[in-house]
A protein has these predicted regions:
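Ribosome-associated RNA-binding proteins
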Residues: 2-189
């Protein structure tokens, strides 16, 4: 009897338990794609390539048209734009500068259901490192941020490729939370 009384007499202490965050559920930036669509080949495209290389510090590749459109004077596989893919430290540094041009504000509709973020910058001279040059002109750009979680490798690997289960996919709300905490982004509804 004394043993049962001592067990009952011990009071359970409530611990201040903080919710543990599973590291495999923490989203991160996989890549940032910066695109300038010029719509034509030639000198204007070369100027756009020099602008994007100056801003990102990386050499761009040309994007090609997929179809022929006689009204616009396009042929299939004709160079019509340029893009750069940034990863790692370069990506985060560029993203800080790009968000600074938008005053750290992003619209809610810029986030998609898979947790990615896309927005545009109407004028490349909004970057602090750029000044207006009448010989080059003004170029706008599209910025797409692709998000990932640890374990996303299974959808890209060659052997035993798998789909990401829905419970592990990045949700729109997780991405918003990531950008507000990491980059102090204000999401405008």
């Amino acid at each position: 009897m004394t043993a049962s009384k001592t067990k009952k007499s011990k009071s359970k202490k409530k611990k201040n338990v903080t919710k543990k965050v599973n590291k495999i559920n923490k989203p991160d930036i996989e890549k940032i794609t910066v695109n300038i669509g010029v719509g034509e080949a030639g000198e204007r495209l070369k100027k756009a390539e020099s602008v994007i290389e100056d801003i990102t510090g990386q050499k761009p590749i040309e994007t090609l048209s997929k179809t022929t459109n006689k009204d616009w004077g396009l042929r299939k596989r004709m160079p019509i734009g340029c893009k750069v893919t940034l990863r790692g430290k370069r990506a985060t540094e560029f993203l800080k500068n790009a968000l600074e041009t938008r005053e750290n504000k992003v619209a809610d509709y810029s986030f998609d259901e898979e947790g990615n973020l896309s927005f545009g910058i109407p004028d490349h001279t909004l970057f602090k490192s750029q000044k207006y040059n009448p010989d080059i002109g003004i170029f706008g750009m599209d910025i797409s941020i692709t998000m990932k979680k640890p374990g996303y490798r299974i959808k890209h690997r060659r052997i035993q490729k798998r789909k990401i289960p829905s419970r592990h996919k990045i949700k729109k709300e997780e991405t918003k939370e990531f950008f507000t905490k990491t980059f102090n982004v204000e999401v405008i509804e």
